[in-house]
Amino acid sequence: MAPTKDFSTATNGADSWDDVADFVTKKGHGVKGLSERGIKTLPKPFHQPLEERFSEKKILERASIPLIDMSEWDSPEVVKSICDAAENWGFFQIVNHGVPLETLERVKEATHRFFGLPAEEKNKYSKENSPINNVRFGSSFVPHVEKALEWKDFLSMFYVSXEETNTYWPPICXDQMLEYMRSSEVLIKRLMEVLVVKGLKVKQIDEIREPMLVGSRRVNLNYYPKCPNRELTLGVGRHSDISTFTILLQDQIEVLHVRKLDDTGNTWVHVTPIAGSLIINIGDALQIMSNGRYKSIEHMVVANGTQDRISVPLFVNPKPQAILCPFPEVLANGEKPLYKPVFCSDYSRHFYTKPHDGKKTVDFALINY
């Protein structure tokens, strides 16, 4: 067997795509493995195009996403705050959300445990080795179509059943992720009650509409190791989520940025983590179902030069067989539909066949009048 390339000697950033792909992807070391080798210069395949790189000059000073206390979640004041945030920001941070703080801590600990496994253990869940498509370990986003790789490792797990979870999810983190998903169910129902029933005046979320809104779950464990030349790359490029909405758990490392809505320039809002909080962001599916009233917003993760970071997004998605289209109640006053009906599975497939590219995915469903 040929020896593994010593990336610690890389000084000119010119390492070939094949060398990096072999080490990061095929051997399962991930970008964590690169970082741990003490590289001083970022390998060339991670260099983002100039127009995609992030600059501190793009940050809008003294601005922040809304912070909402969910303890009185069904009060008129809180309902209005949530709906206003979904319309005007697409992102908001919540406290007193009902998910036990000890559950969140166990999730973060389990995430660190998984990424602390040897490369050969993590690589058992790679695209080539995983016994099931619903569990996937990898790096970047879709490396085979990206012109520049993102500085991130991930484990993605799509929930189907408890039986499949017990059989195929990594034992080192599976119980904690299941606990997190179960503990979030009440919060999910409350958000749907506020955003859909109260906000969009949909009469009820019945057995037909519930799968259309929240029929599936995917949880990702993300790891962003410290990065040399962090200004040259990104942890995650600018994109909007395709979910109904996403519940994001993150640590205290400040790297998440959200595009300012209705801004004609290229300015972003820095998201400051609050201990014990969760971040909610509206996804493309709910933007479509609300006929554009609620907004899925571009966001990105910048690389950090001194600290490792984790995040755990829980994607609350429509069922794959669901049809995405505006609710009839939203169009009842004669409002023209902005989006054509599309299968959720087709929309998702479109998203995963291209690199992150801002808000372009939603154009897949847009009606061109």
Curated annotation (Swiss-Prot):
Record flagged with keyword Oxidoreductase: yes
One Pfam match: 2OG-FeII_Oxy
GO biological processes: coumarin biosynthetic process; phenylpropanoid biosynthetic process; response to UV-B
Reactions this protein catalyses: (E)-4-coumaroyl-CoA + 2-oxoglutarate + O2 = (E)-2,4-dihydroxycinnamoyl-CoA + succinate + CO2; (E)-feruloyl-CoA + 2-oxoglutarate + O2 = (E)-6-hydroxyferuloyl-CoA + succinate + CO2
Enzyme type, top EC level: oxidoreductase
Residues engaged in binding 2-oxoglutarate: 224, 309, 311
Keywords attached to this entry: Dioxygenase, Iron, Metal-binding, Oxidoreductase
Limits of the Fe2OG dioxygenase domain: 215-318
Family, as annotated: Belongs to the iron/ascorbate-dependent oxidoreductase family.
EC number: 1.14.11.61, 1.14.11.62
Cofactor(s), names only, from the UniProt record: L-ascorbate; Fe(2+)
InterPro entries listed in its UniProt record: DIOX_N (IPR026992), IPNS-like_FE2OG_OXY (IPR044861), IPNS-like_sf (IPR027443), Oxoglu/Fe-dep_dioxygenase_dom (IPR005123)
Residues engaged in binding Fe cation: 239, 241, 299
Official protein name in the record: Bi-functional coumaroyl CoA and feruloyl CoA ortho-hydroxylase Diox2
Alphabetized PANTHER family for the sequence: FERULOYL COA ORTHO-HYDROXYLASE 1-RELATED, OXIDOREDUCTASE, 2OG-FE II OXYGENASE FAMILY PROTEIN
Function recorded in the entry: 2-oxoglutarate (OG)- and Fe(II)-dependent dioxygenase (2OGD) involved in scopoletin and umbelliferone biosynthesis. Converts feruloyl CoA into 6'-hydroxyferuloyl CoA, and p-coumaroyl CoA into 2,4-dihydroxycinnamoyl-CoA.
